[in-house]
Design a protein with these regions (language model features):
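TRNA-recognition modules of translation machinery and tRNA-sensing kinases, especially anticodon-binding
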Residues: 1-168
Length: 168
């Protein structure tokens, strides 16, 4: 909340129409799809871009309301080919995700940096000293830039190359 976000809770299940409208219904491999009793198509939301865009269309009336950010901490479902990392990353997991809307690319980039710094402060308050930020793939969910915060330890399947220059 310190970075001007608003916590909300979005639905675990959404109608498939939102996903069809975005073009991702048939392109995202990890979607859990099912039919309701009436025969309607539904999706267990592995992420909420479709839902939040639909929501923002109804609440943002002018660009003057930007930047606008909502976030949630919620259970996610992804039908991944190979669930990994034991209990940390299975097909069902809890994730904090945030969605922000900006008038300019420059404002988006500045806000992204504010979010990144906020996470670093959270980890410091928790006493986590071995957390590093690494560039990562946007994966099935898409996007242009992504970072992951990883706790350096001997377990897990990722290999990190670290140097004193700060480029990880």
């Amino acid at each position: 909340d310190a970075i001007d976000g608003q916590e909300i809770l979005m639905p675990v299940v959404s109608g498939a129409d939102l996903w069809r409208e975005s073009g991702r219904y048939d392109s995202v491999d990890v979607l859990v799809k099912f039919k309701g009793r009436s025969g309607a198509d539904y999706v267990l939301n592995p992420t909420h871009e479709e839902v939040v865009v639909d929501y923002v269309k109804s609440v943002l009336e002018t660009y003057r309301q930007m930047p606008f950010m909502v976030y949630q901490i919620q259970t996610k479902f992804r039908d991944e080919l190979r669930a990994r990392a034991g209990l940390i990353r299975t097909r069902e997991f809890i994730m904090k995700d945030a969605y922000s809307f900006h008038e300019t690319q420059s404002d988006l980039e500045q806000y992204y940096n504010r979010c990144h710094t906020a996470y670093e402060r959270i980890f410091a308050r928790c006493g986590l000293k071995n957390v590093v930020s690494v560039m990562s793939s946007t994966g099935d969910m898409g996007g242009s830039v992504a970072h992951e915060f990883q706790l350096v330890n001997d377990m897990g399947e990722d290999t990190l190359f670290l140097c004193d220059c700060g480029f990880n």
